Amino acid sequence: MAFTPFPPRQPSSSARLPLTLMTLDDWALATISGPDSEKYLQGQITADVSNLTDAQHLLAAHCDAKGKMWSNLRVFRRDGGFAWIERRSLRDVQLTELKKYAVFSKVTIAANDDLVLLGVAGFQARAALAPLFAALPDAATPVVSEDATSLLWFEHPGERFLLVTDVDTANRVTDALRGEAQLNNSQQWLALNIEAGLPVIDSANSGQFIPQATNLQALGGISFRKGCYTGQEMVARAKFRGANKRALWTLSGTASRVPEAGEDLELKMGDNWRRTGTVLAAVQLDDGQLLVQVVMNNDMEPDSIFRVRDDAGSLRIEPLPYSLEDA
């Protein structure tokens, strides 16, 4: 029996978020298994999975030969192989690309829609989950596995948990939290990812950016010491030759509409407006505030004013919860 997604409601900012249980249907799961799974994945993505323990997860990019990202992936070990979470809109394309050379390796690469992705965040999220599992992940142990469940811990913008689990456990968690937690869909998790400065690559922006343009180097998503992987030459060139001139920014403010992924924004230049950037994701919160994640030049002035194209509202830069200085 399939798990029924929760109905949508306007997302809240992390500062005002009550205990919330979310179905993450806009994200999707994929796996690689088999004797060559580690070697194969290591040759395809930007992060070093050979050093990944069972208690860790990491962000990585899967690039084309030009170093442009098909997708970014949240990778962790599961069931003797690896699993990763990415946006559902581009999973099929990403898996098609990943499988291109798999015929030469002993691996099985597959989408997995049998398992359920849940998010738990907001007021006293840890206390709410604690009675339901023997142990919860934390900063020292960001992944905990229990039976069919992988629990992933995230620090920003406030402590939150991502559960990869079977339908029975998802129903058990939902039944336990239904009375005290508000229910929501993927949009709330998306809003939290935007606040956290975690890049959201959907199909509209697949194949458009090198990893550094979305701050992956600052998020531990690129190893410059590992062996070859697809697109490595271009990714390395961006670092060592200073070829990357873009960065991911979080903006907040107001607008009469929510911009789509792939749109540009406008930057105020004196009395005029100039088109700039590419929107990765945007969400309107329950207080009317608009959050926008956008890739722009990495030398933007912190007091710059932006707007959704031809809109009366305005957007300003929000600080990221991590530094780009040494990235």
Swiss-Prot record:
TM ranges? none
**Which residues bind folate per the record?**
W27, W189
Give compartment(s): Cytoplasm
| GO CC, any one term | cytoplasm
Tree of life domain:
Bacteria
Tagged with keyword Nucleus? no
**Pfam families with a match to the protein in the record:** GCV_T, YgfZ_barrel
The record's section on InterPro entries has: GCV_T_N, GcvT/YgfZ_C, tRNA-modifying_YgfZ, YgfZ/GcvT, YgfZ/GcvT_CS, YgfZ_barrel
Q: Main role?
A: Folate-binding protein involved in regulating the level of ATP-DnaA and in the modification of some tRNAs. It is probably a key factor in regulatory networks that act via tRNA modification, such as initiation of chromosomal replication.
Spell out the NCBIfam families in the cross-references: PRK09559.1, ygfZ_signature
Q: Which family does it belong to?
A: Belongs to the tRNA-modifying YgfZ family.
* Database matches in PANTHER family: TRANSFERASE CAF17, MITOCHONDRIAL-RELATED
Name of the protein this chain belongs to: tRNA-modifying protein YgfZ
